[in-house]
């Protein structure tokens, strides 16, 4: 299937089948061959053809990154485009869900009271989280709520959502009138320009819950007038105060001139339904928005007694105004493209770090030699070291070196000396350093700080290198003698063909090939200095972002010198 075009990491996913199509593109189910998880990959093509579509996509992927909740669909990954400047499609990887609530309602006419309660509980729990972030979904409907066979629901499609900020007006131009009218609150009927509040989502949840109870839409209006007729047939004629909140002049005049209607008892409209469920539904469908409960208040309703504990339900911190600055200023397609690229990098942390540091090398995405070597050695480690190290194909790379791991039990008869490593300098912009653990406080507890240095049986004592990265805390050398010894060892034990890494990063590239010691983790902790404690099984050097990659070790759980960017997956 020609699905990924020229995207470089497409081999990570094994496409299964097409599960959806639309004007935006196509959705396929797939297997993530790195994790074994089933995923849904949404290919959105020509995203910059229309600026409004691109802004909607940016809004959705940004909100789904910021709103992490069990009842909101999760973006697991966004594939890197082959070019920072010229990409047109994006591939968003979601967790795979079986179906949506619309299909569940249509296919099941025997949903139980427990189903009804659990479905509403999950929707309100997600809504509470969304609203505490000052986000309004604005397009809640059964098709935008995904479902699994185990009755798990997740809200999706935040393309029409908006974030409200305390210092800005909440009145916005309602550009997306094509959103489904059936689930739209009465104060929005016919309005292209409206002030909105969280109550619009509460109304939508009420309409969805009524559809779950009956199996059919509650207010399937053919137009605005018909929609208002259906609402008032059930709820009765609203008060003049409620009518005044409707911004559309024609809708307001129509309701004001309407004959008086009495509300229909919900017990007649919804027979054989739990009375507590009907009381809550009536609150959710209050015509006046100020009479509707918040999601948090609805979760505290007696209907959820024994199921929900409001104080236990998670809330979200309000979203920063800077995240949605693009909503309040005029932007070009290039601006939106750069912002979408920035969002994609959120799923590739090392590239994001380089991007934020101002590195121009973020245009180099793949496939690089660094990535290929990293992927090969990851496979070797996953296979338990059953196959040997791969042959190097570039003469500038160091030869393969085996660094023993702590899996070899130390001989109790050998001398042990507590040692720590020297602090590795912080990387400059455009360069990366492996995960060094700062050890500014020697008294702080650190599970990686205690080390036992045991004789490496693979290196003869005569070849021992007094490396600057493995100091003996009780050395008898003077500073001058010590430096002379280091220089002598460096000349003696670093052959000419292996000097490339020292030239690239002379201050940070450790020589671990001839060390007679390896670290163990069993010894008790002794005196420590304020130097950095570096985990023995994760030694990192640094090099320019697009520099030469050097990797050591062909076996499982061995130490490695890793150059370039960190693992992107």
From Swiss-Prot:
Activity regulation comment: Activated by threonine and tyrosine phosphorylation.
Family annotation (Gene3D superfamilies): Phosphorylase Kinase, domain 1 (3.30.200.20), Transferase(Phosphotransferase) domain 1 (1.10.510.10)
Keyword Transferase in annotation: yes
Catalytic residues in the record: 139 (proton acceptor)
Sequence positions that bind ATP: 19-27, 42
A matching Pfam family: Pkinase
GO cellular component: cytoplasm; nucleus
GO biological process: intracellular signal transduction
Keyword Transferase: yes
Protein name: Mitogen-activated protein kinase 7
Originating organism: Oryza sativa subsp. japonica
